[in-house]
Amino acid sequence: MAPKMKRVLLTAAAVILCSNAAFAAFFRPDVRPGYGVSRRGWLSDYHAPLKGTNLDAPVYYIEGEKPGAAMVVLGGTHPREIAGHTAALMLVENAKVLEGRLIVIPALNVSGYGIHDQSSNIARFHRVPCRSGHRLLPFGDRRVDRSDQSADPQQYRHQSGAVILGSKGHDGAEARNINRNYPGLPDGTPTQQAAYAVMEMILKEKVVLAIDMHEADTPSWSYSRETGQPYHGGRLAYMLVCNPKDEAMELGAEAVVDVSDRVGIDLKYEPSNKQFRGLSHLEIGDASPCLSFLFETPNPGQDSWREAPDVVTDVRYPLNHRVGLQLEMFCELVDLYNQSHTDHLVMKHVPDYKTLMEDGIGKWLN
């Protein structure tokens, strides 16, 4: 190869690498706020050291004219779990609050959205219809980008000293999993600081109910790549995990029964495992008066046995099915809370499961 041509190729490669690095560093998911949004803030408003970093997530406030209860929706904790992010987008782009305050973080792990999912070959962006034509939904990695944090330890250890149940000592990457790092530390790793900022938001805004929207593998039979034996996946799919507080468990049980009856799907619920430290549903509820929940929908992209999963239009588990369930569950929890408290969150213009199954997601995205 001629020296001049070699220099040109090396220069082009350097430009591509720099461009990719810059893209990851400055990437923010596309959020198009509706008229109901009162203001936008940042996670760093609750913990200043996050300002200007790739862990500083946008926060959207949808506030009613009448005071009432404050509730939080967390989407995008794991950027590969696309239904939670999309459901949070629909709230930001459609919801109007009449009473109380709704606080939404559509893309909590903004760092993870800046990189490709490290466990699959699923595309970074997925084109979907919307009211203005088409838009791209992002698909990233479940953890914070390595470049935004120091090297992983060999074994992850929660700030309490606990290790992950069943750990074999090779799970150090979980140090970059926001949903293993609650309640967080003000002077900890960037991931711990992001979790700490969420806790500070919960406390300072006097949040009474929070839901963290996630996805799991699908309830399907397949063969293990390691053992070759058949197994049934998706234990967590269609699961509402409730903080063990009596009120949270009672609210969760009633919500699961009501939503199951309406949508014709057998949903499940269980209490947080107190030995599994760092998860939002356990730690948020234990560290505050908030009733904290986590809801899992089945995502084909979580199935290790699928060669080319379709995370948007899968025949059995399409995105509108999963987003509809996330919103149906959240709204049911809100309604049940309102029935037993004097302070309420009252919303309108939030699509339910039936509407999204009929309309698809396009009519509800700006």
Task: Describe each region flagged by the PLM.
Residues 11-20:
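Bacterial N-terminal signal peptides
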